[in-house]
A protein has these predicted regions:
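Sec-dependent signal peptide recognition
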Residues: 2-10
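C-terminal motif of bacterial Sec signal peptides marking the signal peptidase cleavage site
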Residues: 13-16
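Conserved functional acidic sites
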Residues: 18-242
Length: 242
């Protein structure tokens, strides 16, 4: 667990440097060196259930609806499959995400998540297909930890701390999503219900720093709302769980 411990000491140090009264994003998060060595012994090999704000329940499908940048109708399904994939010697759960725009499938993605023994959920990559008129036209955004310099990131901390920022993925120049914890006591109302004690994150891509989303994660449920707050418009809200 030494390497993971070093990773979180770095995060804690970055959080300590943040001004509690400053709501701005970290000035240059890309300036912080990112390096993590993965030891498969630090990760669960079975019974992967996620954590409070990112539960992993095999067989569940979350359905989100909303609007895109140009007002198009968006529908996203997120299915927690019973399939796994070994990446860097770590067992990852495969989660399939399908995005529809005006009822047409535009993206089909398989995400790979793992859980360490401290309860943090890691993101080991994705296989993504862009689709037009039923035909695959690209695989932009695809990456796999351990390949071509890519490293896994944290998709959800077991114990998120306000003001802390962290990398969710890392392939230099290709996949550089990061998140900053804004609150662990937020509220969110969506078609599926109203929730208190939510985690509110600012999430953005270092390659597109002018575009920022706020995401709300309900305890015991996971992501319930994502809304663009800078650079773009659009919102997705949880409407159903199957």
């Amino acid at each position: 667990m030494k390497n993971i411990a070093k990773y979180f000491l770095l995060l804690a140090a970055l959080a300590a440097c943040e001004d509690d009264d400053d709501d701005e994003l970290p000035e240059n998060p890309a300036d912080a060196e990112y390096n993590v060595t993965i030891d498969p012994a630090d990760f669960e090999t079975s019974g992967i259930t996620g954590n409070l704000f990112f539960p992993i329940e095999v067989g569940k499908t979350y359905i989100y609806e909303g609007s895109g940048v140009d007002g198009e109708v968006i529908r996203v399904t997120v299915e927690f499959t019973d399939q796994t994939k070994a990446i860097m010697g770590v067992t990852c759960v495969i989660v399939r995400e399908m995005e529809y725009e005006d009822e047409q499938l535009i993206e089909d993605t398989y995400d790979w998540y793992a859980q360490d023994k401290e309860g943090n959920v890691w993101y080991f990559g994705e296989a993504s297909q862009e689709i037009e008129d039923g035909v695959v036209v690209g695989t932009s955004g695809s990456w796999e930890a351990g390949v071509g310099g890519a490293l896994p990131g944290i998709i959800m901390l077991a114990n998120p701390l306000p003001n802390l920022w962290y990398r969710q993925e890392y392939l230099k120049g290709e996949a550089e999503d990061v998140a900053q914890v804004l609150s662990t006591a937020a509220s969110a109302s969506v078609p599926y219900g109203s929730f208190q004690g939510c985690l509110q994150n600012a999430e953005w891509n270092l390659l597109e720093p002018g575009v920022v989303e706020h995401k709300y994660y309900a305890p015991g449920l996971g992501l319930v709302k994502a809304i663009a707050v800078k650079g773009e418009s659009g919102v997705e809200e949880l409407v159903e769980i199957q």
